[in-house]
């Protein structure tokens, strides 16, 4: 029978000092012996997805204490990728994931906490907390802040839906008037919550639900809706049950590594491919799998991508649907239900409620459930009122979207495409693979061959695109923006958005060893591995070379002979210590970022730290 970790600090005369300090936090004699459960919050006024979380930690803590636990809350950092985008701030986004994971480990282990409730929401916060949860392997439940409502405005006498990406594209489009750009900017992000499309934040929160570490509805129920409050209340109660199951009943099925096992990881990736999620999720799932000591690699993702169809299409891949529409169609479990009927899921998995996948679908799949309360929850919709307050409205759709032939979520028979929304490409240009979000690629450019224009920074590429130096048919390559080379593996949302602004969204390709925002669409290929700073072929290409992309056949080739590539590699290595560094880039890199770069692996490993360098 495992002993409560917290007993280390609460029992025995030699811990009198620790108990004295616990008492100073409000604990009393009756609390010593109860499980100490930490509420890992991520409130900040910098991030719309987190601006409403201040009071939600207290809500969870009250339920923990009412259920027989002791609650202790702390906060992690949270970077807003959209605000950090397009300048030096983006260098810090991905490294913040490791800091978040480490900070959770530090706080939990330093104070011997027994379990956690993780209140996350946005891009690097959810994966950072996931990595920590699987590293620590103590009972955990995730409850996120929820998605933002989609923006709406009237343009050309038509009401259209908007999101952050629309503001970026219109702001850079020379054909758009200042008045229209301003109107879109003011309408794009109307409420608190994670940006309203299937961008990285919402993709990750959906995957957490598929992994079994959060409750049904967590990935799609709007941040503003009153129904979301119940998820927080339930999390506080349920974590005490999970904690006692493990520590008092020796039930290891309550631990995250036994819930989010390899079968669950495969299900989560299957969901990601079917819903056309952000390419960043690949990076984060690979990193989380390493923390869980699960053998889950790019090869597994490649195999899944070849058999899973696209059953859901959401912004930025279409303007018709946003997360509020996914929820109306049944949310994550609506998609999982269709995947299950197609025989594409591992059924022998459980979630934090203790339900198997078939049991969960029976209760929560809107196409089969008889539970009217569940149907009501999935009718929770937007209010269209600007607010930063959680649970501030209780509007509902008049009906559910259960049309699996022409609705937001489709059945296998009526899939958007036979191929899924993500694909892994291999070739002499990316020997260890690269990722493309096929859900956002127009059918006309699934095969694309063109001349290369090489840039050694995102800034240079943006200047060239906006300056008219990139033309139809070009393959834009941005290198030395990987985990080491950036450092920090910047997102390339501005270059892809500006290609659209210049009318080149369906006429050019963009390839990088950096990564893309979940808001990216178009022929955008990222995570090229090995990266330039690690000696990848991407470091050897020159202006005017030709790259051939063949998504249906999962291929990306630099059209040069092996002899020419070898000769260029020899010339590159002759540069000595500067061999795998950009030639003409001036960039201020802080000591903190240099420390990150010194241990970072390429994207095919999840951009995690290289344990071999630390003797691990």
UniProtKB/Swiss-Prot annotation:
Recorded metabolic or biological pathway in which this protein acts: Amino-acid biosynthesis; L-isoleucine biosynthesis; L-isoleucine from 2-oxobutanoate: step 3/4; Amino-acid biosynthesis; L-valine biosynthesis; L-valine from pyruvate: step 3/4
Catalytic activity as recorded in UniProt: (2R)-2,3-dihydroxy-3-methylbutanoate = 3-methyl-2-oxobutanoate + H2O; (2R,3R)-2,3-dihydroxy-3-methylpentanoate = (S)-3-methyl-2-oxopentanoate + H2O
Residue positions of the active site: 517 (proton acceptor)
UniProt binding sites for Mg(2+): 81, 123-124, 491
Gene3D superfamilies the record matches: IlvD/EDD C-terminal domain-like
EC top class, as a word: lyase
Key words, A-Z: 2Fe-2S, Amino-acid biosynthesis, Branched-chain amino acid biosynthesis, Iron, Iron-sulfur, Lyase, Magnesium, Metal-binding
InterPro entries associated with the record: Dihydro-acid_dehy_C (IPR042096), DihydroxyA_deHydtase (IPR004404), DiOHA_6PGluconate_deHydtase_CS (IPR020558), ILV_EDD_C (IPR056740), ILV_EDD_N (IPR000581), IlvD/EDD_N (IPR037237)
EC number in record: 4.2.1.9
Biological process according to GO: isoleucine biosynthetic process; L-valine biosynthetic process
Superkingdom of origin organism: Bacteria
Residue numbers binding [2Fe-2S] cluster: 122, 195
Names of required cofactors: [2Fe-2S] cluster; Mg(2+)
GO cellular component: cytosol
Residues the record lists as N6-carboxylysine modifications: 124
Matches recorded under PROSITE patterns: ILVD_EDD_1 (PS00886), ILVD_EDD_2 (PS00887)
Chain coiled-coil ranges: none
PANTHER family: D-XYLONATE DEHYDRATASE, D-XYLONATE DEHYDRATASE YAGF-RELATED
NCBIfam families: ilvD (TIGR00110), PRK12448.1 (NF009103)
Annotated function: Functions in the biosynthesis of branched-chain amino acids. Catalyzes the dehydration of (2R,3R)-2,3-dihydroxy-3-methylpentanoate (2,3-dihydroxy-3-methylvalerate) into 2-oxo-3-methylpentanoate (2-oxo-3-methylvalerate) and of (2R)-2,3-dihydroxy-3-methylbutanoate (2,3-dihydroxyisovalerate) into 2-oxo-3-methylbutanoate (2-oxoisovalerate), the penultimate precursor to L-isoleucine and L-valine, respectively.
Protein name per its UniProtKB record: Dihydroxy-acid dehydratase
Species name: Salmonella typhi
Species classification: Bacteria, Pseudomonadati, Pseudomonadota, Gammaproteobacteria, Enterobacterales
Gene name of the record: ilvD
